[in-house]
Curated annotation (Swiss-Prot):
GO cellular component, one term: extracellular region
Domain text: Has the structural arrangement of an alpha-helix connected to a beta-sheet by disulfide bonds (CSalpha/beta).
Protein's UniProt name: Potassium channel toxin alpha-KTx 16.6
Family statement drawn from the similarity comment of this UniProt entry: Belongs to the short scorpion toxin superfamily. Potassium channel inhibitor family. Alpha-KTx 16 subfamily.
Job of this protein: Inhibits potassium channel.
Length: 58
């Protein structure tokens, strides 16, 4: 049981770190595919989505 709680805490810490790496860029969008190329130019990765009409890069 002790190991399970340690693993759970480690998972939460890693999740917080991964989620905090996502960043908004100043590009308006209506669909996620509109964010792929701008995010590739900014971060080097095409992992992106359109959120509240603004691109979020991962």
């Amino acid at each position: 049981m002790k190991i399970l709680s340690v693993l759970l805490i480690a998972l939460i810490i890693c999740s917080i770190n991964i989620c905090s790496e996502a960043g908004l860029i100043d590009v308006r969008c209506y669909a996620s595919r509109e964010c792929w190329e701008p995010c590739r130019r900014v971060t080097g990765s095409a992992q992106a989505k359109c959120q509240n009409n603004q691109c979020r890069c991962y």
